[in-house]
A protein has these predicted regions:
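Conserved hydrophobic/aromatic pocket- or pore-lining residues that grip, position, or stack substrates
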Residues: 35, 172
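Short beta->alpha connector loops
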Residues: 26, 74, 100-103
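Short, intrinsically disordered, charge-balanced linker/junction segments flanking boundaries
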Residues: 34, 177-180
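N-terminal cap/lid segment of alpha/beta-hydrolase-fold proteins
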Residues: 29, 40-89
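Short beta-strand elements
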Residues: 5-33
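Cap/lid segment of the alpha/beta-hydrolase catalytic domain
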Residues: 100-170, 178
Length: 180
């Protein structure tokens, strides 16, 4: 679209007959029990985190903190930026996990309007990558995945107990625990 001489472009995704979509795989008979057990085991581990003020992303309206959230007794962690309004009061909370890919949080202020408009926002990454690391440090770590951007998606796929994404899903639950 062109508005006032400036061209804007964006993409959208739509589903054709989404009501006709059917699962490709069968849900395991113990699916709910498995996840309830995993979440209960995670709750046994104390909620442990550090929260460090990040001046460069704070403004006169919002505060930003870098959070390191420990997930489990294996000391696996995720990092995220926690933004919230400087004004007093209770605020709704927005939990923002990333899209696919191995990356750090590059532009934390791109969604600052959430906090400016009165929401607490926790944007986190799922791989344990400190967003304050240098590009060189990131390159060294990503080489561990043999340069395959999404190699983690099949890491441990042969076992639901060892599947990489199990930790990711539980990290999302832990993020909610942290925000509560």
């Amino acid at each position: 679209a062109t508005v006032d001489g400036k061209t804007y472009s964006h993409h959208i995704k739509v589903g054709f007959s989404p009501e006709k979509l059917r699962p490709y795989t069968t849900m395991p008979s113990d699916f709910k029990e498995f996840w309830e057990k995993e979440k209960a085991e995670q709750k046994e581990f104390p909620l442990t985190y550090t929260k460090e003020h990040v001046e460069k992303y704070s403004t006169d309206k919002i505060d930003c903190y870098l959070v390191k959230l420990q997930l489990n007794k294996r000391r696996q962690c995720v990092y995220g930026y926690l933004f919230y309004p400087k004004k007093e009061g209770k605020f709704p909370v927005v939990l923002c996990p990333p899209g696919a890919g191995i990356k750090t949080i590059k532009e934390p202020l791109r969604h600052k309007y959430y906090a400016e408009q009165g929401c607490i926002r926790f944007e986190f990454e799922i791989h344990g990558l400190n967003p304050e690391m240098t590009d060189e440090e990131f390159k060294e770590i990503s080489n561990a995945f043999n340069g395959r951007e999404n190699g983690y998606l099949t890491n441990g796929l042969d076992s639901r107990d060892n599947y990489y994404m199990k930790r990711v899903y539980l990290a999302c639950v832990r993020g909610i625990d942290f925000l509560n």
